[in-house]
Each structure stands twice: as C-alpha cells, then as structure tokens.
C-alpha cells in the first residue's frame, strides 16, 4: 500500500524514541556531523520533518509538512546535545499550495520558507545549491534525516542517518505506482532490490546528488525499504524558476505553477 509518509507523524506521542543505534535510516548509517550543514530539523504541532537551507534566509521542505507553530532548527546533529552554533528560526513567510487539493503526491509537494531572521554561516550551518540539471538515471545520491530507523515499527533516533540510493527510471516507478501521471515532477530514487530508504519522519528531507539539492522526500511505500518500492522526491530542478523568482521578489505566487 502506498501512502504519504507523514501520516505516521500524527502518532508521535505513541512512538518509541531511540538513542544512537546500530540499526540505522533504513539501511543507512549515522551521518558524519560535518556532512549536513544545510540540513534542518523542522517541527510543528502536527509532525516532524526535515528541510534544506538554500541560502541564509530560505529553507525548502515538503508542502505536507505545514502546520502551526513551525520551528526550524539548523546546526543540529544529536538532538540531545546542543551545538554551540545551533540556530532556531520560525517562518516569516511560507510559499506553498494552501489547499491539499492543489498539490498531490506527485506534484507541487514543496514549500519555500522565509526565515524570520537570516542565519549565520558556521561550521555546522551552510546552504546547499539547487540542482543545475535534471536528475540522471543511475546517479548515486545521498538521503538523510531524523526519520525512523525501523519499519513498520517506528523508532525515531536522536541523530540523523544517511544512506546512498540511486536515481531510478521514472517509467519503472510508473509500473509500480500506476497512479503516477505520464510526466510527474518527481524524482524516483531508492534501491530497486530494497533495503535502503527514507521513511516516516523524513518528509521534506533532501536528496543530494553531486553536491546539489535534487529532491525533497514526498512519499513512498509502507513499510519502507521494500523491494520494488522506491521513494518519490519532489524534483527541485522543475521548480527552480519558481524558487528563484520568489527569492528575488519577482513573484508572489504562493502556489507554484
């Protein structure tokens, strides 16, 4: 069964939390503390997600991560240990499709957040550049986040975990997910044989290819990391003009075209 992974976040009060574990994002390892200066921990009254710092004032995450009392934490690794350069912000503006009827699991699941004050770059805080070209099938890319390290049982870690996955041909994903349109603005990525995957709590997390932000986790199979069930990531390259126009102040279009 396919579903939006954010649904599991609604049960956070019932979940078991874990300290550092040897079992990791599904099939991954604890991220090196210095490899994710752009990674943001995004929370609200409804769920926990991840996001990506793209310049000192703007963060990208998934539209379905929206909620009240949103908080964006940067410079975070172990959530139980405060880094000296950790910085916390709240949204000043949010640009996304306001109604869930305007975005789907394969289109417009993206939110651009303007922070209330810019962050200062530091050892553990620095932006990543947007994808400069479409995803290349077969490319090995990096996923990361504080999502569950086990599925279907949900165990949320204190530290982010990372894994390498591959860009998979879109038509292969259509074969598994027939509801996908002929051309969706998503990147299909994972391990076709299963074993490595992002999962519940990773929504909005970055897909990093060649050092650039190629995608944001949108949805996938449940349980996670199953064979023939790669994840679907919002394709950043397809939204780069909208993102750049908002940042430059050339448009106020809340919902991307």
From Swiss-Prot:
Q: A GO biological process this protein is involved in?
A: proteolysis
Q: What is its main location?
A: secreted
Pro-sequence positions in this chain? 19-24
Q: Which GO terms describe its molecular function?
A: serine-type endopeptidase activity; toxin activity
Active site, UniProt feature: 64, 109, 203
Does the entry feature the keyword Hydrolase, yes or no?
yes
Glycosylated residues, chain numbering: 120-121, 250
Q: Which residues form the Peptidase S1 domain?
A: 25-248
List the CDD domains hit by this protein, alphabetically: Tryp_SPc
Signal peptide positions on this chain:
1-18
- InterPro entries noted in UniProt: Peptidase_S1_PA (IPR009003), Peptidase_S1_PA_chymotrypsin (IPR043504), Peptidase_S1A (IPR001314), Trypsin_dom (IPR001254), TRYPSIN_HIS (IPR018114)
Q: Would you name any one GO CC term?
A: extracellular region
A Pfam family that this protein carries is Trypsin
The cellular location(s) given in this protein's UniProt record come to: Secreted
Q: Which UniProt keywords apply?
A: Disulfide bond, Glycoprotein, Hemostasis impairing toxin, Hydrolase, Protease, Secreted, Serine protease, Signal, Toxin, Zymogen
Tissue-specificity statement: Expressed by the venom gland.
Cystines in this chain: 31-162, 49-65, 97-255, 141-209, 173-188, 199-224
Enzyme Commission number(s): 3.4.21.-
Do the record's keywords include Signal? Answer: yes
Quaternary structure, per UniProt, is:
Monomer.
Q: What does this protein do?
A: Snake venom serine protease that may act in the hemostasis system of the prey.
By sequence similarity, the record places it as follows: Belongs to the peptidase S1 family. Snake venom subfamily.
Give the protein's recorded name: Snake venom serine protease nikobin
């Amino acid at each position: 069964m396919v579903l939006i992974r954010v649904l599991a976040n609604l049960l956070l009060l019932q979940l078991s939390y874990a300290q550092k574990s040897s079992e990791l994002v599904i099939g991954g390892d604890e991220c090196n503390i210095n490899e994710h200066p752009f990674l943001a921990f995004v929370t609200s009254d409804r769920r926990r997600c991840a996001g990506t710092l793209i310049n000192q004032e703007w963060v990208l995450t998934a539209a379905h991560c929206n909620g009240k009392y949103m908080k964006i934490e940067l410079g975070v690794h172990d959530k139980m240990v405060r880094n000296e350069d950790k910085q916390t912000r709240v949204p000043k503006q949010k640009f996304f499709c306001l109604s869930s009827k305007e975005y789907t699991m394969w289109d417009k699941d993206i939110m651009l957040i303007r922070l209330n004050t810019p962050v200062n770059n530091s050892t553990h805080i620095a932006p990543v550049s947007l994808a400069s070209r479409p995803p290349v099938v077969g490319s090995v890319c990096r996923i990361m986040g504080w999502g569950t390290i086990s599925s279907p049982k949900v165990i949320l870690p204190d530290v982010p975990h990372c894994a390498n996955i591959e860009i998979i041909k879109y038509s292969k994903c259509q074969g598994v997910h027939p509801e996908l349109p002929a051309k969706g603005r998503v990147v299909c990525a994972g391990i076709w044989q299963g074993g490595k995957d992002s999962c519940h709590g990773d929504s909005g997390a970055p897909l990093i290819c060649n050092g650039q932000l190629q995608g944001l986790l949108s949805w996938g199979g449940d349980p996670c990391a199953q064979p023939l069930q790669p994840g679907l990531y919002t394709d950043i390259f397809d939204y780069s003009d909208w993102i750049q126009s908002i940042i430059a102040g050339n448009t106020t279009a809340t919902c991307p075209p």
